[in-house]
Amino acid sequence: MPELPEVEVVRRGLEEHLSDGVIHDVDVRHPRAVRAQPGGAAELVALLDGARIQSIERRGKYMWLVLNNGRALFVHLGMSGQMLIHEASDPALPTTHVRISARVDVGEKDLVLSFVDQRTFGQWQVTPVVADPHGGFTGVPVPVAHIAPDPFEAVFDPAVVARRLRAKKTDVKRAILDQTLVSGIGNIYADEALWAAGVAPSRRTRGMRQRDAVAVLEQAGAVMRRALAQGGTSFDSLYVNVNGASGYFARSLNAYGRAGKPCPRCGEPIVRVQWTNRSSHFCPQCQSS
């Protein structure tokens, strides 16, 4: 699943091309793409037709388009979702795995927004907007209301979140993947943040020093900012920005995906272990447990 930097790259692309655009001619081509919409495809089409895009926002891995009808188009990219933008006259309009398409008029431009999703885990949902319980936004879509602020937000306080983290009875990697504690961090950036902070993923949160917990959270933000500057992390063709280009932060990873290779800090081979239904990558020498 795309993590914060990858979703932010997409959000910025949508903001650049679609801000103040008017949506029409919405075509839902796969029912799973609107499975959370109470009234299905017909309702989503009716709520989007003629709506103007006021802004494009993001919290953690979740993105939404603020509409002028008091609602928001919530976009979940799932494992393989892509939001691709083309001129309506472009002969290279995508045709494979397009689950939803929409025309968007932006000034004199006639654009097509295609939601391409090979694995069909992603979705669109037009939803009411509710007050943000964390105060970062004027309002958030209903599916985002329970999601915690991410490290890029002004309302995110590493010291406060660190205290909550230390109150949990779990391991630190599981804690920072909890989207109700801190959002936006997935498996890749969890491994990278823990490596950067010198903390083993198995370290128990109870008994953790405050400064170590803060360091993990601060490093998560720092790592994701570096990833954002490089367009995110792409291991295959499924993650791309709105123009179809891939990010290249994979070349800068220190732990994730580097099993058996020397730790950039101490030279000890990076270890890969099974962790729940995923993998953890860490240095057994310089990440303390």
Curated annotation (Swiss-Prot):
Pfam families: Fapy_DNA_glyco (PF01149), H2TH (PF06831), zf-FPG_IleRS (PF06827)
InterPro entries (UniProt xref): DNA_glyclase/AP_lyase_DNA-bd, DNA_glyclase_Znf_dom_DNA_BS, Formamido-pyr_DNA_Glyclase, FPG_cat, MutM-like_N-ter, Ribosomal_uS13-like_H2TH, Znf_DNA_glyclase/AP_lyase, Znf_FPG/IleRS
GO biological process: base-excision repair
Catalytic activity: Hydrolysis of DNA containing ring-opened 7-methylguanine residues, releasing 2,6-diamino-4-hydroxy-5-(N-methyl)formamidopyrimidine; 2'-deoxyribonucleotide-(2'-deoxyribose 5'-phosphate)-2'-deoxyribonucleotide-DNA = a 3'-end 2'-deoxyribonucleotide-(2,3-dehydro-2,3-deoxyribose 5'-phosphate)-DNA + a 5'-end 5'-phospho-2'-deoxyribonucleoside-DNA + H(+)
CC cofactor note: Binds 1 zinc ion per subunit.
A GO term, aspect molecular function: class I DNA-(apurinic or apyrimidinic site) endonuclease activity
Family stated for the protein in its record: Belongs to the FPG family.
Role of this protein: Involved in base excision repair of DNA damaged by oxidation or by mutagenic agents. Acts as a DNA glycosylase that recognizes and removes damaged bases. Has a preference for oxidized purines, such as 7,8-dihydro-8-oxoguanine (8-oxoG). Has AP (apurinic/apyrimidinic) lyase activity and introduces nicks in the DNA strand. Cleaves the DNA backbone by beta-delta elimination to generate a single-strand break at the site of the removed base with both 3'- and 5'-phosphates.
HAMAP family given in the database record: Fapy_DNA_glycosyl
Record protein name field: Formamidopyrimidine-DNA glycosylase
